[in-house]
Amino acid sequence: MKKIYDMLKLENIKILPGVKDWREAIHVAVKPLVDGGYCEERYGDEIIKNTEKLGPYYVLCENVALIHGSTEQGVIKRQIAITLLKEPVKFKEDGYDVRI
């Protein structure tokens, strides 16, 4: 069984000034996973499709979103990436500000 610290690599942690919108936030958040071979290129687009269909169900609370997907959406191996935004982004107009 993989331990959580085995699924979080230093190269998958990013601190960024901000993004233009929630779609860009998803793409920059999954980029380290794509680059590392943990998911397919389409992974970010699949999460965006789910968000457009179901809403931002992964926004847990103020400042925190836990975007995720499945093998059907392009996940190859389990891995965690953390993206910290200095300027928050909203995943819906009346929703929480998200930084992580």
Task: Mark where each language-model region is.
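Cytosolic covalent-transfer regions centered on His/Cys nucleophiles
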Residues: 1-100
